[in-house]
């Protein structure tokens, strides 16, 4: 009776009907986030009086913290609360921070404005910690692995999920920035708060349609057990026929009997062989009941191997994420000093150029999903056309090339400023059309279509089934670390250039050398790309175990 009820629930719940509710929620939430982040440097420099470099570092630090909290949120989701409850709880925390924003520029006294504003930002960061890693995985959970149709739909889901995020950010950039700069910051922040309220209401409406995964205990404990068990048996021979396969029968029973979660057995691999010792049954294990800190199943060991394989990939993506931070910082200040007029009366706000990234992505993702993938699939026979790692690699190359272009455009802007005697006139517009910035914004969009979506898919698909919120948190955390690295690069460049008598990143960009800074980023990206290509070439993809399999892997 319970099995038939479970089957009916799986048929009536989940799928696109459920995922669409969560996608709409993400659109509203991302509208709020990008409505704040995309023009934050303007608020910090113009309203709070911070220098360009200080504002850039503050933004990078805030984004970095926002992207590190998800590790805690993912732990709570996978081990204690479950993804649904975590998303709901942290959405209210996020709303609290958002509500504090308009209060900081209206009710709060001017001398306290900066403190309250940054308090609001970091309360938002706490809320982001639970929302970010769980909402995407919760949406992806609505597509099962056992159903072939739903499994195929999941590949398209990641494309359209990112497309929804970009749609939200584009609307925010086009609408909110004009309100913030032309009407008032308090109205702009109030609209942001309203969008979060709408997101929570929509999320609650969709409750009857959701498939909810049950938390299975601390994933970190399972990882620690494998490490400890392998260390305890480091002297033993890891001969293949000594594996403790009897414990896999327990996992198979778990797979058949669990109604809410589906746990699949992993194929054994030859990588990280030292961990295989955790599965060996020695004399102590024969004579006593199983101690999970001495004896682990093959499946548990393979789960740890999945995580270890992703660590080098994670490291190789840090510089790409450091590059992304330029979009919300120096790109804006660069555009603010160029000719942005249309006709005689209309001037484009610098932050509005970020919508070009969104438009590029909104055009490319449907083309990628409906044209590129089917065409390439005929050649590669891969269900996604190209692998996640190949997709990421293309994006990394585009990002590296883009920073070279950024440096060239900035070098030309500086030359025009010198030719017109504007070196010491930072408030004067350099007579160079802001359309010169189009290539770098378009290339950011192209790079994101390949790398960001590829990262989301890789860190979801290659994580153990019970640790997918952790996988999303790991993906988000690399963005956070990239933001911290960007802050470190800015500080290092400031220190070194100042010691040589010519500071590269001063408030007056006509006296700065933003072009040199961009080329340093390009060089670091090139090194990172080479490291990534080496790691990706030796990466083993996850493969599920067939009944008669011994050791399987897919490169």
UniProtKB/Swiss-Prot annotation:
InterPro entries, sorted: MFS_trans_sf, NRT1/PTR, POT_fam, PTR2_symporter_CS
Q: Which Pfam families match?
A: PTR2 (PF00854)
Q: Which Gene Ontology molecular-function terms are recorded? A: dipeptide transmembrane transporter activity; tripeptide transmembrane transporter activity
Q: Which top-rank group of organisms is this from?
A: Eukaryota
Has UniProt tagged this entry with the keyword Transcription regulation?
no
List the record's Gene Ontology CC terms alphabetically: membrane
PANTHER family, A to Z: OLIGOPEPTIDE TRANSPORTER-RELATED (PTHR11654)
UniProt protein name: Protein NRT1/ PTR FAMILY 5.4
Q: Which organism is it from?
A: Arabidopsis thaliana (Mouse-ear cress)
Q: What is the lineage of its organism?
A: Eukaryota, Viridiplantae, Streptophyta, Embryophyta, Tracheophyta
């Amino acid at each position: 009776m319970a099995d038939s009820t479970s089957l009916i629930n799986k048929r009536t719940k989940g799928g696109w009907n459920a995922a669409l509710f969560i996608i709409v929620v993400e659109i509203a939430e991302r509208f709020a986030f990008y409505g704040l982040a995309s023009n934050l440097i303007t608020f910090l420099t113009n309203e709070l009086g911070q220098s360009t470099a200080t504002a850039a570092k503050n933004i990078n630090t805030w984004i970095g913290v926002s992207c590190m909290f998800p590790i805690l949120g993912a732990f709570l989701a996978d081990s204690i609360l479950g993804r649904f409850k975590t998303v709901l709880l942290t959405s209210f925390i996020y709303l609290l921070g958002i509500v504090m924003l308009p209060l900081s520029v209206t009710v709060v006294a001017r001398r306290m404005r900066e403190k309250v504003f940054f308090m609001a930002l970091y309360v938002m960061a706490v809320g982001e910690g639970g929302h970010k890693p769980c909402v995407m995985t919760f949406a992806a959970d609505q597509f099962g692995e056992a159903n072939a149709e739903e499994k195929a739909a999941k590949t398209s889901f990641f494309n359209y999920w990112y497309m929804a995020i970009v749609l939200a950010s584009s609307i925010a950039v086009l609408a909110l920035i004009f309100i913030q700069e032309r009407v008032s910051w308090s109205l702009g922040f109030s609209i942001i708060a309203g969008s979060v309220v709408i997101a929570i209401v929509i999320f609650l409406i969709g409750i009857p349609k959701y498939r909810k995964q049950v938390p299975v205990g601390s994933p970190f404990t399972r990882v620690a057990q494998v490490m400890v068990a392998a260390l305890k048996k480091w002297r033993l021979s890891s001969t293949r026929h000594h594996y403790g396969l009897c414990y896999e029968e327990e996992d198979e029973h778990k797979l058949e009997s669990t109604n809410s979660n589906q746990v699949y057995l992993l194929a054994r691999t030859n990588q990280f062989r030292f961990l295989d010792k955790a599965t060996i049954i020695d004399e102590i294990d024969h004579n006593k009941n199983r101690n999970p800190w001495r004896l682990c199943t093959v499946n548990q060991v393979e789960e740890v191997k999945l995580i270890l394989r992703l660590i080098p990939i994670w490291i190789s993506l840090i510089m790409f994420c450091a590059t992304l931070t330029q979009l919300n910082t120096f790109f804006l200040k660069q555009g603010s000093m160029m000719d942005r007029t249309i006709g005689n009366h209309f001037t484009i706000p610098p932050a509005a150029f970020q919508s070009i990234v969104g438009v590029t992505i909104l055009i490319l993702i449907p083309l990628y999903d409906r044209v590129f993938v089917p065409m390439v699939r005929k050649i590669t026979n891969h269900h996604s056309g190209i692998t996640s790692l190949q997709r990421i690699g293309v994006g990394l190359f585009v990002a590296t090339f883009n920073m070279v272009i950024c440096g060239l455009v900035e070098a030309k802007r500086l030359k025009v400023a010198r030719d017109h005697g504007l070196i010491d006139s930072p408030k004067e517009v350099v007579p160079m059309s802001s359309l010169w910035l189009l290539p770098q914004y378009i290339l950011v969009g192209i790079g994101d279509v390949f790398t960001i979506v590829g990262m989301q898919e890789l860190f979801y698909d290659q994580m153990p089934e019970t640790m997918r919120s952790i996988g999303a948190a790991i993906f988000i955390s690399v963005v956070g670390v990239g933001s911290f690295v960007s802050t470190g690069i800015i500080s290092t460049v400031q220190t070194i250039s100042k010691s040589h008598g010519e500071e590269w990143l001063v408030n007056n960009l006509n006296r700065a050398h933003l072009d040199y800074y961009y080329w340093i980023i390009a060089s670091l990206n090139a090194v990172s790309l080479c490291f990534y290509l080496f790691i990706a070439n030796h990466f083993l993809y996850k493969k599920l175990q067939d009944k008669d399999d011994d050791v399987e892997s897919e490169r």
